[in-house]
């Protein structure tokens, strides 16, 4: 007489159904990642053409485009320290074809202003591309030749000096406010919609100083049109070995590092996020790309979505606390 184990058969059937269901859930994402991308990709930059973020995006677009096999279109959407660009990306389809290429203010905007969106829920990190210290630059005709001379001048003439920023809440803004606090100087904030117009007015002598990123500031320092007084990193820049850090002047905790990274709309398939992140990581590891970046005073990063998330959490914690403690505003 043949005995049938109905319990075992039922369990095997249930497991088979579960396995098929899991496979069915994975296959569409895998297929989507394999098919992605099949049309041009748009990178939205929150600042004006010609500034540091714009230049960095365009530099990275070429190798990433080759790796993905599709053209990359860089679109500038300046205004409100990145808010307008972020909104445009959030409202785009969550398919990986529209990314935000943002920078330092992303981590402090939620502390500085009331936003019409949640930057930590409506956007997801893809990859941090680069890091770079700022360079404190002044017009070549400025009366002060060194960092300490500028501080002495500022202390002797309270409120006379002003400083440019590429937008409220950016690294140039917070670096200047940190210096106000640490060095005891009084100077006036003049915000611009991007680094390019800030540099233009600095060259014309319309503003006293600017914590420029290397992309926009370094060429003018090297040509003698601007004077570099200090840099904001933990160590001297390879591209400017003779320019001291702010730390070297006795401000041992002073460090401000600009960064650029990619974000996608929430809901973008993880497989697509991973594909995009891998392309950025691979591009920043290419010897020729690294050589160009380092020569511009930039540190290539290229990390995973989770590593970028961890970095952002640290930035939000540090700068959020500082903004609140020192009552820094967007004004």
Annotate each predicted stretch with a short phrase.
Residues 101-106, 195, 212-217, 232-234, ...:
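Beta->alpha turn/N-cap motifs
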């Amino acid at each position: 007489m043949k005995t049938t184990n109905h319990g075992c058969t039922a369990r095997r059937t249930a497991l088979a159904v579960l396995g098929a269901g899991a496979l069915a859930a994975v296959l569409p994402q895998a297929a989507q990642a394999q098919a992605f991308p099949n049309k041009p990709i748009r990178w939205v930059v929150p600042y004006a053409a010609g500034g540091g973020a714009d230049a960095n995006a365009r530099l990275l677009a070429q190798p990433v485009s080759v790796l993905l096999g599709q053209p990359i279109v860089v679109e500038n959407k300046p205004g409100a320290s990145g808010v307008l660009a972020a909104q445009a990306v959030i409202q785009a389809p969550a398919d990986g074809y529209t990314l935000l290429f943002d920078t330092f203010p992303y981590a402090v905007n939620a502390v500085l202003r009331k936003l019409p969106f949640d930057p930590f829920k409506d956007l997801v990190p893809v990859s941090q591309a680069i890091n770079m210290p700022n360079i404190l630059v002044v017009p070549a005709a400025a009366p002060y030749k060194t960092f300490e001379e500028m501080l002495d001048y500022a202390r002797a003439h309270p409120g006379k000096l002003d400083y440019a920023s590429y937008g409220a809440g950016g690294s140039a803004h917070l670096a200047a406010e940190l210096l106000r606090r640490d060095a005891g100087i009084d100077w006036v904030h003049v915000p611009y919609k991007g680094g390019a117009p800030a540099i233009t007015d600095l060259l014309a002598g319309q503003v006293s100083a600017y914590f420029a990123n290397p992309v926009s500031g370094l060429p003018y320092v090297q040509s003698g049109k601007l004077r570099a007084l200090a840099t904001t990193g933990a160590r001297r820049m390879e591209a400017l070995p003779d320019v001291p850090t702010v730390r070297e002047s006795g401000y041992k905790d002073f460090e401000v590092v600009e960064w650029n990274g990619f974000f996608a709309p929430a809901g973008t398939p993880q497989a697509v996020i991973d594909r995009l992140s891998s392309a950025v990581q691979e591009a920043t590891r290419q010897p020729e790309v690294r050589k160009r970046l380092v020569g511009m005073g930039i540190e290539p990063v290229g990390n995973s979505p989770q590593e970028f998330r961890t970095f952002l959490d640290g930035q939000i914690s540090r700068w959020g606390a500082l903004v609140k403690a020192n009552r820094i505003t967007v004004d």
